Each structure stands twice: as structure tokens, then as C-alpha cells.
């Protein structure tokens, strides 16, 4: 689960087929550790420097050739003899770098964890690229022509047995998906939010072979899973991807992290009309007198169920959302309207800021009506306040572009009275950032690209970093330390092992700490610590802007804080599917090269080198090579 914390494992009945759940669906607690099934895909990343200096990688588009054609020819040259398809999510970012994603195929089927991303500069030359294409032997197609593989229903049962999913399938039926090869939908299954799906694909195994698998998709609230079930046995699970990562508004204004930092105020028309052209209370076709609009729909969800449309939302015919709240109030349900408004405000403010930083419709952002700006619509964020499916946590589900994101904010029971996570902006921002990193890494159509332990850890780290950067105050210096989740958890130390700090005494974390660590949250703390160093190096050079939005000059933030955030966002779009620390670092360096011609190269290198990810650092799954060295010129 990509949530704020790692949830404990609660056992479910072992015989899921003998005891199906009742009609409808209930909240399912995870009965197995999904980390055991994480993908182990290895990608390569040729950064901008390597690409420019290697004649074998130099490739320039022909006159009048599109960037998609250029990228396609490049992949053909790099991977001769392999078959692949262009993923329909290519775009040109606001830094003028074009991003094109490819999926390898075999015998007419996708190899679901074999991807190639090509970044093309505005000069028509290849800027950088990432590659996780399968290089082994392609199986003979005879098993497909003879249909020598299991039925998708067998794969669904195998998923249920292996992952202990309590689904009711006694009334299930199956039908093929129109226009798709070996793709099916299960109707009449209880225990899921939406109908399960199965699609026949290949899966590249760590031993260098390809397995024919059924990719079984099951959304069971807390876990929205893609399970790769061996199509021969119908039982062996080769890997699992989880999409879930645990007017007038009276609110705590943007920049205040929680109730300890200030007071609520009335804010009038806070939206950015470029990012939210319909305002926050309209989707361009209809105006809503409630907490619903183009970017999100916020409501209470005490049952923890999925039928959000009919749930309670505060209503105001004159769009004046002013409701009482005090941190000393109890129970939390007594201030649910204030909670919903706060969550709606924070999520929309972040949407508008991210738009300025480059997370727009064409890059896969979350909007119901994309208004002809590219990408796929119908995917605002479902914002559940005081969600009854859990406590002391939060999570965000990120399906591919065109399907709504889903944020669940919980009540925290670590204090008396209990505290509502929606009033800690850092938690909301952390969760929303899962949606950003999943949509940008590998392209908007692929939400599987932060599925390895290290990539998933960086997913947690990006969330912590963005939340921390946003809460900076005018008087802060690089000596300022920040914790994560301290107010909600009622613990001044927060919910991470160390506070975010540039002091090696206060926070000694370095690249070597990732060795042997299988917790995405502790890995993420290492990554966010490095980004915190990066931010302060850039602030020392460019100054600090604590306004709600950056001042841009030629598409570049003029201050160090927002420049760091911009480079992080741009780096996500450049890096390969399932990156490691070294590749993500190189993507940030490339982002600066594209945005500023490398003006901040040394500041970036110094930040990473301080924490062991310097020049010469190398990724190895079991023993990472650390380095505090700087490249020449720094």
C-alpha cells in the first residue's frame, strides 16, 4: 500500500473460495505481505551527458519528422529485431522535452514489465532514454495458437488463493473485452469496487525468462492490484503491482502544515484561473454548490465504502463554506464539514501549484474535464474525509490516466481527543504526490513504474519532500529541521526515523542505509533527506519564495525552493520505469540541463554527494557503492 505508514497485517479466512463475502463489498485487510511479490525489474538510464557523448546514441530527427517518429526510429536502432508498440500517452513538457513511451511485445502480446522511454530535445535530438526491454529468448507462439494455457477464471481463483482475497465468485460470469486480444471482464463478483479484469500478457522474470501470465486486476479498496498469475499453472504469482499508496473557504491557509502553526481564516476565490479555468466548483458543464469540481470531489466516508457520489458534502448556495472547528472538539464527526472543506482546499491548491510546475492535462494530471488540453479526462481525485476503513494512516490509489485517483484520509487515535488527518496539510500533499509520481514516471498510461522496493521508496520520499518544501517559512534557514506527521500522530518526533535536516548529526541517513532495507517508508526517508539537501543548496544560491506559487521567468522558478520542486517534477518524467536512486539523481541533473542548461549542476551534485550518492555511486541490489565525490568542475 502506498500510504503514509505501513499498515499491520490482519489475517482473513484462509478458505476464501469456501466462504465468499456477502453481496456488495466490504473493506478487506491485507492478509499477506505484498512486498514479497514486488517487481524486480531492472532498468538502464542513459542520461543527457552519456547520450550526447556516445556516437552510438546520437540520433537526430529528419526534417519534418515528428518527435514520435524520431523516438520510434531510435528504439528500432537500439533494440533491433524486437517488437514493440508506442504507448498512447506521449507529450511535450513545458521544458520543451518530448516524452515517448514504448511497451515491448512478443507474439502479439504485451510484455507488461518491459518498457522503453525516450526523451527528445526541442532540437530534434535524443536527450536521454530509459530501457527495461527484455533481452532473452522469446517463447514460441505455439502455446498461443494451440491455446495451451489456463482459463482466466482459474487465474482469478489463483489470485484469490495466493493473496487471500475474500471475493464472492459463485455468481460470476465472464465476457471478452471488445477490441482487445485475450482480455476479459468478470461480472457478478462481490467484494470488489469494480469488476475484475484479466488480460493475457507476458511477464519478464528475474531469471531472464518470459512467463505467459494472466494480468488479473482487482480493486478491493485498500489495495488495487495487478496480479501476474502464471497462465500454465493458474496459481503461481510472478509479481504484483499495487495502485494504492496507503468561493469562500474557512481553512488553515496554504503553507500552514497543521493547527499548531496558525489559525483558520476566510479565503475568497483562491483558485488559479490558468490551472483551474472552471474554478474549483465547476467542471465546465455544471456548477456545484458543494465541495465538488473539476479537480476533485470531497465528502465524508464513515462506512469506508466506495459509493462516494451519494455521500455527505457541505452545501452552500452562495459558495460560502464556513464551518466551526477546534482541535479540542470531539468526536471528529462533529466537525466533518470543516474537515471536508479543508481537504478540498488543500488538494485543489496543490493541483494548481503542480500545474504551474508542469503537471498538466497532457502529462496525466487529475481533472474531470481536460477541456481539449490533452491527456484523458474523467479522473478528478475522490477525496474521502474521515474515511471509516482505517485509522492512523492515509492512502492514495493511482490508476492510469483517465480513471479517478482516490485519497482516503483517516482519523488518528494517538491523542485525546482524536485528530483528523485532513487538517495536517503535509499528509494530504504526501498522498497526492503519489498520484504525481505514478502518472509521470513511465508515462500517464502506465501506473506500474514505481513497483520495485527502491522505486516505491522514492515514491514515499517525493511525498515527504514536497510536503516539507511547501511548509517552509520566511525565517527558515538550512539549520531548520522538519518532522513528518507529528501533529496527527501526537508525537513531536513525527512518524519517520529522523527529522528532515541538513545536519549529519541530527539526520545521519545516507545511500548506504538503503542496503537490506525492505521498508518503502524508511527508504523514502533517505531519498527525501537528499532532496532536502538539494533544496537548501538551491535556496542558498537563488533565495527562497514562501508564496503559494513561484515567480517564473522563461519557465524557470526564480527561487531555490520552487526550482527544486520543479526539477523533481521534471525528473520524474525523464527517469525510466522503476528507477533506482542513481537513475533518479541523474534524471534530476538532466532536468536541470534541460531547464537551465545545467546552471545548478554543482549544487545538485553536492547535495547528493553529501549523502553518499555522489560521483561514482552505483546501484547494486545487495551492496550499493557509495561515494562522496564530486565530478570535475565542481
UniProtKB/Swiss-Prot annotation:
Residue numbers covered by the propeptide annotation in the UniProt entry: 19-246
Signal peptide coordinates: 1-18
Binding, Zn(2+): 430, 434
Recorded GO MF terms: metalloendopeptidase activity; zinc ion binding
Keywords tagged on the record: Glycoprotein, Hydrolase, Metal-binding, Metalloprotease, Protease, Secreted, Signal, Zinc, Zymogen
Region ranges (Disordered): 282-313
UniProt-annotated glycosylation sites, renumbered to this chain: 318, 545
Domain of life: Eukaryota
Pfam family, one: Peptidase_M36
Any one biological process term the GO annotation gives: proteolysis
Compartment(s): Secreted
Bias kind Polar residues: ranges: 291-303
Annotated EC: 3.4.24.-
Stored InterPro entries: FTP_domain (IPR011096), Fungal_virulence_M36 (IPR050371), Peptidase_M36 (IPR001842), Peptidase_M4/M1_CTD_sf (IPR027268)
GO cellular component, one term: extracellular region
Location of the active site: 431
Cofactor section: Zn(2+)
Cofactor note: Binds 1 zinc ion per subunit.
Family to which this protein belongs: Belongs to the peptidase M36 family.
Function according to Swiss-Prot or TrEMBL: Secreted metalloproteinase that allows assimilation of proteinaceous substrates.
PANTHER family: EXTRACELLULAR METALLOPROTEINASE MEP
Protein name: Extracellular metalloproteinase mep
Organism of derivation: Aspergillus clavatus (strain ATCC 1007 / CBS 513.65 / DSM 816 / NCTC 3887 / NRRL 1 / QM 1276 / 107)
Amino acid at each position: 500500500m502506498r500510504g503514509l505508514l505501513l499498515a499491520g497485517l490482519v489475517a482473513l479466512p484462509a478458505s476464501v473460495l469456501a466462504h465468499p463475502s456477502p453481496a456488495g463489498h466490504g473493506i478487506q485487510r491485507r492478509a499477506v505481505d505484498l512486498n514479497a511479490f514486488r517487481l524486480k525489474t531492472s532498468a538502464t538510464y542513459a542520461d543527457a551527458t552519456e547520450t550526447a557523448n556516445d556516437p552510438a546514441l546520437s540520433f537526430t530527427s529528419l526534417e519534418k519528422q515528428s518527435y514520435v517518429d524520431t523516438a520510434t526510429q531510435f528504439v528500432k536502432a537500439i533494440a533491433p529485431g524486437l517488437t514493440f508498440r508506442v504507448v498512447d500517452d506521449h507529450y511535450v513538457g513545458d521544458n520543451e522535452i518530448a516524452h515517448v513511451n514504448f511497451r515491448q511485445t512478443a507474439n502479439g502480446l504485451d510484455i507488461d514489465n518491459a518498457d522503453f522511454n525516450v526523451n527528445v530535445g526541442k532540437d530534434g535530438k535524443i536527450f536521454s532514454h530509459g530501457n527495461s526491454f527484455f533481452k532473452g529468448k522469446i517463447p514460441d507462439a505455439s502455446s498461443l495458437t494451440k491455446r495451451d494455457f489456463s482459463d482466466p477464471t482459474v487465474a482469478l481463483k489463483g489470485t484469490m488463493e495466493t493473496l487471500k482475497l475474500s471475493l464472492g465468485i459463485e455468481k460470476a460470469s465472464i465476457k471478452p473485452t471488445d477490441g482487445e486480444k485475450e482480455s476479459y471482464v468478470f461480472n457478478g463478483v462481490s467484494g470488489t469496487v469494480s469488476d475484475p479484469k484479466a488480460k493475457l500478457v507476458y511477464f519478464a522474470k528475474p531469471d531472464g525468462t518470459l512467463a505467459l501470465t494472466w494480468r488479473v486486476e482487482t480493486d478491493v479498496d485498500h489495495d488495487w492490484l495487478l496480479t501476474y498469475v502464471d497462465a500454465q499453472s493458474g496459481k503461481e504469482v510472478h509479481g504484483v503491482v499495487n495502485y494504492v499508496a496507503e468561493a469562500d473557504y474557512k481553512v488553515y491557509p496554504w503553507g500552514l502544515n497543521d493547527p499548531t502553526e496558525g489559525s483558520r481564516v476566510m479565503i475568497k476565490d483562491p483558485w488559479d484561473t490558468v490551472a483551474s479555468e472552471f474554478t474549483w466548483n465547476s467542471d465546465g458543464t455544471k456548477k456545484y454548490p458543494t465541495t465538488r469540481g473539476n479537480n476533485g470531489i470531497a465528502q465524508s466516508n464513515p462506512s469506508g465504502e466506495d459509493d462516494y457520489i451519494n455521500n455527505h458534502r457541505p452545501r452552500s448556495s452562495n459558495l460560502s463554506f464556513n464551518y466551526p472547528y477546534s482541535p479540542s472538539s470531539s468526536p471528529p464527526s462533529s466537525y466533518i464539514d470543516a474537515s471536508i472543506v479543508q481537504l478540498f482546499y488543500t488538494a485543489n491548491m496543490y493541483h494548481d501549484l503542480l500545474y504551474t510546475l508542469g503537471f498538466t492535462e497532457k502529462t496525466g494530471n487529475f481533472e474531470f474535464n481536460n477541456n481539449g488540453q490533452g491527456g484523458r479526462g474523467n479522473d478528478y481525485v475522490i477525496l474521502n474525509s474521515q474515511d471509516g476503513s482505517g485509522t492512523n494512516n492515509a492512502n492514495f490509489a493511482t490508476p492510469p490516466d483517465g480513471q479517478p485517483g482516490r485519497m482516503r484520509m483517516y482519523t488518528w487515535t494517538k491523542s485525546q481527543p482524536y485528530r483528523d488527518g485532513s487538517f495536517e496539510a503535509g499528509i494530504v500533499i504526501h498522498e497526492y504526490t503519489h498520484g504525481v509520481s505514478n502518472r509521470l514516471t513511465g508515462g500517464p498510461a502506465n501506473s506500474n513504474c514505481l513497483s520495485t522496493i527502491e522505486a516505491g521508496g522514492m515514491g514515499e520520499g517525493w511525498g515527504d519532500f514536497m510536503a516539507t518544501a511547501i511548509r517552509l517559512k520566511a525565517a527558515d534557514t538550512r539549520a531548520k529541521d522538519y518532522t513528518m506527521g507529528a501533529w496527527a500522530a501526537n508525537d513531536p518526533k513525527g512518524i519517520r526515523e529522523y527529522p528532515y535536516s541538513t545536519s549529519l548529526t541530527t539526520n545521519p541517513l545516507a545511500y548506504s542505509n538503503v542496503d537490506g532495507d525492505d521498508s518503502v517508508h524508511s527508504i523514502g526517508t533517505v531519498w527525501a533527506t537528499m532532496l532536502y539537501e538539494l533544496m537548501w543548496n538551491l535556496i542558498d544560491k537563488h533565495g527562497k519564495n514562501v508564496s503559494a506559487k513561484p515567480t517564473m521567468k522563461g519557465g524557470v522558478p526564480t527561487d531555490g525552493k520552487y526550482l527544486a520542486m520543479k526539477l523533481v517534477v521534471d525528473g520524474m518524467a525523464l527517469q525510466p520505469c522503476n528507477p533506482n536512486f542513481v537513475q533518479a539523481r541523474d534524471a534530476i541533473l538532466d532536468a536541470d540541463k534541460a531547464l537551465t542548461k545545467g546552471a545548478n549542476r554543482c549544487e545538485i551534485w553536492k547535495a547528493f554527494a553529501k549523502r553518499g550518492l555522489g560521483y561514482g555511486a552505483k546501484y547494486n541490489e545487495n551492496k550499493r557503492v557509495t561515494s562522496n565525490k564530486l565530478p570535475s568542475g565542481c
